[in-house]
Curated annotation (Swiss-Prot):
Keywords assigned: Amino-acid biosynthesis, Cytoplasm, Histidine biosynthesis, Lyase
Record EC number: 4.3.2.10
NCBIfam families per UniProt: hisF (TIGR00735)
Main subcellular location: cytoplasm
Keyword Cytoplasm set for record: yes
Name this protein carries in UniProt: Imidazole glycerol phosphate synthase subunit HisF
Length: 256
């Protein structure tokens, strides 16, 4: 693997503040999004992801003003998601200063929107945000189910098959988040990463479960091209990004 592994802090935004919870619940305040973005840029983050965690469930649009402020302050790629439903939403985000848009619930509801967005802007601007959870009852072939609305609603759709369909439709990369592992700090769901990696060729961002620097190399080993986390960066040591990169490098993978 010669392409550098990207380390991406995730800023879950609710009502203009960065929050972090466990399993998408019990949200705790982590600070001002633009301030944190500036801090992470300076600390060596490769990219930043903003997810408006209540935009879809509360039917609110993503805060374009926050994106514009962040884009003025930071000089690494910004991905923004939450409430992205159509071409016009992506257009507004890109004009505000985002480099990429992330889509989740709207694509599950109407997969053709992926084709429409990528036809307009190209695959490189669209990230599929895939919130998946384990199902033990054999209700999906892979044992992983797509969820929507911040992990609150099951869909009955197989997560691996959905990843493949989205890639076929043109998404540029997939942000794979384990709802079960999210916020637990117990490590990534490696089985889930391996299953999706085997099904798609587009870059794969692993998310959900990171608690310490040593949790990251196994995710890369399982097939992730990038690793995304929140708690370890928001509430961990100030040099957490450097520690994560050092751990990945020590495991034999290139980092920037």
């Amino acid at each position: 693997m010669s392409v550098a592994i990207r380390v991406i802090p995730c800023l879950d935004v609710d009502a203009g503040r960065v929050v972090k919870g466990v399993n998408f619940a019990d949200l705790r305040d982590a600070g001002d999004p633009v301030e944190l973005a500036r801090r992470y840029d300076g600390a060596g983050a490769d990219e930043l992801t903003f997810l408006d965690v209540t935009a879809t469930s509360g039917n609110r649009e993503t805060t374009f003003e926050m994106v514009a402020r962040a884009a003025e302050e930071v000089f690494i790629p910004l991905t923004v998601g939450g409430g992205v439903r159509e071409v016009a939403d992506v257009d507004r985000l890109l004009r505000a200063g985002a480099d990429k848009a992330s889509i989740n619930s709207a694509a599950v509801a109407r997969p053709e929107v992926i084709d429409e967005i990528t036809r307009h802007f190209g695959s490189q601007v669209l990230v599929l945000s895939l919130d998946a959870r384990r199902v033990a009852d054999g209700s999906t072939p892979s044992g992983f189910e797509v969820t929507t609305h911040g992990g609150r609603r099951g869909t009955g759709i197989d997560a691996v098959l959905w990843a493949r369909e989205a890639a076929d439709r043109g998404v540029g990369e997939i942000l794979l988040n384990s709802i079960d592992a999210d916020g637990t700090k117990a490590g990534f769901d490696l089985e889930m990463i391996r299953a999706v990696r085997a099904a798609v060729r587009v870059p794969l961002i692993a998310s959900g479960g990171a608690g310490k620097p040593e949790d990251f190399p196994p995710a890369v080993q399982a097939g992730a091209d990038a690793v995304l986390a929140a708690s370890i960066f928001h509430f961990g040591p100030v040099d957490a990004i450097a520690q994560v990169k050092a751990a990945i490098r020590a495991a034999g993978f290139p980092v920037r």
